[in-house]
């Protein structure tokens, strides 16, 4: 059952404060609205209240059905295209040139732009960001020749660019947001029915699930929130896979950070996890390289794979692999966030890689691409491993994506080093070892060895995704150690309403530990509850 209610500004006699925003909130304000999905739970024995409870799974299935988009956009190039043309630097505009090149070479977005679908229905093409991007992509991919240079449209750049160095990731998020708003405006002009999605949401949008579990009664509450990009802490990670795994580790809420349990009626020790629930078609991974305090850059090497399996990091990692292929890498070359130079490497529709450095477009190979100090990584989901956007044979893709294969391969190599026998063909183990070393593999695709896949009764693969702009955190804020202020009832399933659009790109603490917001809605085992009722359960 889907419940849609509207709460007044004040409920339960309390004027509830607003929490800081997450950096993708503005984008999702009109996309999702405020929703809560749950069913009326019978009074359950505390011992039976767990993530594996059948009643809870029924509701989660409903949540998945409601949150999953039904977009029709292809994930691969409908017709192979060569690289786009170079872009003119109009004065400290390398950051926006790099971001625009990555968007231009995003397969599902480029195919939608080349279809001219938006401009055919747009009633206000003057000043429309979506029309401007459509014209930009069409000119770059279809009507240019080798060596051509374009000047980005002022419609795309003027609202953001002030002829000074800016953050490419911020411009990327700003551009996606304005394109989304343009799509919604077109729909409003032709149909008064509320529209809650757009091609931008369908391509880039995903959802993550937060879970808080009382360690005393085992009662569990779930919160769902949208994300547009996935920032990764790389301060101690050697690879993107390790950073994904590290951010999904369970966090204990103890002492002042303890969680108020609605069943125990007091603050109790709890565990908290945050991981991907609905995977996006296009995955943006942002490596947190810049200090929020000084702007200084963490210029360390972090490896990343050409092919990434996201399945181990899902909230429910079942079924086969969920493969993604790298198609763009945005790079910052410099010492601080307000200096240096931006460029990118992109994979064209015909499968070849190119370095896009303002006006210069040069051929490069995947080896050099994987050696860059990446800032933003762009992956597209692969539903068909034989698509042109993947250069590797299907069998090799399965090998690269399967962590179990990588572990077995490593063990075989160790055994061969200790063996001096020959096989039936007379080939010595030493020769076989040399031959094996020539095989291309993605070492960073391995699951970290220290990970216990079945620890404390929790499923493996939990990824903590904090959609937050790293350059706008409040000083001293620690996302993994925020004070618990929210009293979630047991077995609650909450879908957060996006916050105010006023602070795009501001800090994003873990929302399940923040006060309730006007408009958030919830249905629990005790029935429908308002934010005021939640806060009056004895936790204040």
UniProtKB/Swiss-Prot annotation:
Polar residues bias: start-end ranges: 523-540
A Gene Ontology term for the protein's cellular component: endoplasmic reticulum membrane
Q: Where does it primarily localize?
A: nucleus
Query: Can you tell which superkingdom this protein's organism belongs to?
Result: Eukaryota
As its record notes, the protein acts as a catalyst of:
Thiol-dependent hydrolysis of ester, thioester, amide, peptide and isopeptide bonds formed by the C-terminal Gly of ubiquitin (a 76-residue protein attached to proteins as an intracellular targeting signal)
InterPro entries xrefs: Papain-like_cys_pep_sf, Peptidase_C19, Peptidase_C19_UCH, USP_CS, USP_dom
Q: What is its EC number?
A: 3.4.19.12
> Which region ranges are annotated with the description Disordered?
1-22, 431-461, 499-540
Any GO MF annotation of the entry: cysteine-type deubiquitinase activity
Q: Which UniProt keywords apply?
A: Apoptosis, Cell cycle, Endoplasmic reticulum, Hydrolase, Nucleus, Protease, Thiol protease, Ubl conjugation pathway
Which family does the entry's similarity section mention?
Belongs to the peptidase C19 family. USP17 subfamily.
Subunit architecture: Interacts with SUDS3; the interaction is direct.
Protein name in the entry = Ubiquitin carboxyl-terminal hydrolase 17-like protein E
**Which species is this UniProt entry from?**
Mus musculus
Encoding gene, per UniProt annotation: Usp17le
